[in-house]
Amino acid sequence: ADSIAIVTAPWEVVTVENGIVHKRASIPFLYQGAQSINILEINPKAGKKIGIAFTGQLEKISRIARKHQAIGAINGSYFDMTKGNSVCFLKVGSQVVDTTSLDELKLRVTGAVYEKKGKVKLIPWDRQIEKNYKKNKGSVLASGPLMLKDGEYYDWSQCNANFIETKHPRSAICLTEEGKILFVTVDGRSPENAVGINIPELAHLLHVLGGKDALNLDGGGSTALW
């Protein structure tokens, strides 16, 4: 029933520019409640490139995006709400900005966005992989959990059960079987319009949308798509 609700939803589709499409749907009943979903679909074949941007302080995603002259942007990974720094591995070019805390590795960080020359991969992540990537070329942002890998559901059983099972607003990045990149946000904390979803539900949503690889980026009040 949930798969049918996603496929038959009245998606509003707006072409932002060549190679970038914004899709939005309000679905009255999906995963036990109302859902509000936004997707920015990027086609790399149209010459669109992805990059990882960061700021040394707390700033709105819209401001960071404008600084980098981005067409679209999504918030990524977990941060210290007091200091504003990432608590997950963040490497931009040759600069290692932050490393993943042990707490985050235990809680949920099992994947990462790896970007090199505007091309993106979603890869598994752990402490040993992090050590190896400090010297690798390209930019990296660790996050999690990794939800899909090669079209299959990824194992998130070692992650914190409460984080996995609780419905929240969510942000995610997904690479589709067709080679497109999806920035996806699901709103939440609004019982009448958007109840939010948990990780198994988000993984299912992205699988139905044609996802091959998918990574949860963040959630809660930080969820933002620009």
Q: What annotation goes with each model-predicted range?
A:
Residues 1-226:
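Gly/Ser/Thr/Pro-rich low-complexity, intrinsically disordered segments
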